[in-house]
Regions:
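The feature captures the conserved acid-bearing segment of alpha/beta-hydrolase catalytic domains
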Residues: 49-115
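Gly/Ala-rich beta-loop-alpha elbow adjacent to hydrolase catalytic centers
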Residues: 29-34, 38
């Protein structure tokens, strides 16, 4: 099978898998900047019923969302490195979690550190 046909078959299978799901009830997961992105979506999309942020980074969260309490359950699991860091980003996350209307579970792992990773080397030979 040619590469293009193989890629198309993978996307067709993924589309079938998504179509079989109830997209009116979404749960989201995000790490680091992705954690901020899922916080933003969870606050603005009524289909989202819960969210799990792993070392949530608050930079992508808009001012509009910061002003509005989150209404869905949010589980925050942080590294000790970030949970015990009292910088601006940690303060923003603490404020967001404190004013949330839905249940919030905020935990951190003792002696843990934030892990950074990127897919850029897989997307471009110039990135790796």
């Amino acid at each position: 099978m040619a590469q293009g046909h193989k890629a198309f078959a993978i996307f067709a299978h993924a589309a079938q898998a998504v179509a079989a799901r109830d997209l009116a009830k979404l749960g989201l997961f995000g790490h680091s900047t992705g954690g901020g992105a899922i916080f933003e979506v969870a606050a603005t999309d009524p289909r989202v019923k819960c969210a799990f942020g792993l070392d949530t980074w608050t930079e992508p969260i808009s001012q509009d969302v910061r002003a509005t309490p989150l209404k869905v359950p949010f589980f925050s699991l942080r590294s000790a490195q970030w949970a015990l860091n009292h910088d601006e980003k940690a303060r923003i996350l603490a404020e967001l979690l404190a004013k949330a209307k839905g249940p919030v579970y905020d935990q951190y792992l003792i002696d843990s550190k934030h892990a950074d990773f990127t897919l850029m080397p897989l997307l471009s030979p110039f990135a790796g």
